[in-house]
Amino acid sequence: NNEMKFYDNDPDKDRAIKKMQIIEKVVKRMREVDPTRPICFDSNYKRPEKRFGKDFFKTFDDGDIDDDHSYINWYDHTVFKQFNGEFQKNKREGRPLISQEMSTGYPNNETGHPTTFYTYVHQNPQVLVGDDAYPYGDPNAFLEAHRFITAELAEALRRSNPEASGILHFALLTWFRNVYDANTIDPYPAYYSMQNSLSPLLVSAELWGRHLYAGSTLPVRFCVVNDLEDGSSVPASTITWSLISAG
């Protein structure tokens, strides 16, 4: 299931254990059905050793992997708190760590404005683009912000989390217009930026700021992430880079 969370949110520990035992039966049944695939106990499940203790999991089957859902640059904290391997600090020994729900917000599927619910209830979009979050604003403002924060998050996670086993970013309903019509579906800007950010061989600049001033010194660390499928090494290379003004 998706984000049941009773192992965290149910204040009655004994009742939470009974619920977990029900899911454990499903895990064991799935191992019989297909023993070749790793199992995630629950979407967004991270083994709660602090609550139940390590000894509890010596005899309890809670699957094979941990799955950390996060909304960095959206609900959660800024991407600048993901530059030093913070994501992989949630890794438990012997258990691969993934995220199958990494998201940075929701353009709607028609105009590209942020989805109305988030504008009026959570108010996340206003933090990024102010009044342009509303229906009378320019949708390109939000699409550009969404493109930028999605790509920078993907690169930050790849730069600093070699112990992580994979990140799945929200894509279909957030990177495309008209997703319900194969004849008119059209990529939003985030799609094109993520082509680069998720390329097998990534060259990424770690920038601790978003405001750059003429004449100032720009401290920057360049990282090369090599996920080439054939496992080949990257030969000695030279990075050529420049700053380009959109205005």
Predicted regions located by residue number:
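Localized sequence-composition bias
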Residues: W175, T184, A190, S242-A246
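Short glycine/serine/proline-enriched coil/turn segments at secondary-structure junctions
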Residues: Y75, K89, Y213-A214, G231-S233
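Intrinsically disordered, low-complexity segments enriched in polar/charged residues with Gly/Pro
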Residues: V26-V27, N196-L198, L228-E229
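Proline/serine/threonine-rich low-complexity linkers at boundaries of modular beta-sandwich domains
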Residues: Y188-V203
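Beta-strand-rich binding/interaction modules
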Residues: G215-G247
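Substrate-binding/catalytic cleft of secreted carbohydrate-active enzymes
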Residues: N1-D186
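Short beta-strand segments of immunoglobulin-like
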Residues: L207-L212
